[in-house]
Amino acid sequence: ERMPGLPDLESLPIPEEPVLPDSVPFPPGEAEAWRRLQSFVDWDDPVVHDYAQARNRLDLDGTSQLSPYLRFGNLSARQAVVSALSAIDAAPDTQARKGAETWLNELIWREFYMAILHHFPTVLEQSFRANLRQIAWENDEDAFAAWCAGRTGYPVVDAAMRQLVQSGWMHNRARMVVASFLVKDLLIDWRWGERFFMQHLVDGDPASNNGGWQWTAGTGTDAAPYFRIFNPVLQSKKHDPDGV
């Protein structure tokens, strides 16, 4: 008895194009990536020239928000770097130049973490620093659940975590704040937070995500020292004074 052949193409249903929920603020595609890049670097008074001053403000649109497009190849790192260099050349003053240079440095961090993951793939499983692989974490599951759900009682932490779950995105400063809170206040293993971020981030990149978590935890390359703790109250007052 002969095995049945492959079905005809006409018999295969064409899947419907997925529709992103309105809460995800990143329309897909190369055209949208280029539109955002141009609006960030190309206007008469481009946002990138204020990047050094505005990038940590949670209440301003001071970042490029290009990370999902870099993550999925709608925009290449080379294209972003060329735009950053052009913005540096076009800077009318020292402050504007510093803004574009700061953005370029952030792009370099992204490439650096990719290199780290390539040469040291075990960072996805353990701390980069061998002497920090036996930390006695408390790993309270109830505290972790409250952190995931945005129910810690700290407004800036809770707002950031709810934004992540609802929209798939979180401001970089907020990522550092919530990561520090999880690791250094709740004493929960950074890998728990790393996995949760990868489950929800629309720009989730294994290299950048791991590098960011290990930096905050103090276990990675050129990481924040163990005694540097982001105070969520002070961070809120400084970077989101009106609670936007």
How would you label these PLM feature ranges?
Residues 114, 119, 142-188:
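C-terminal substrate/ligand-recognition segments
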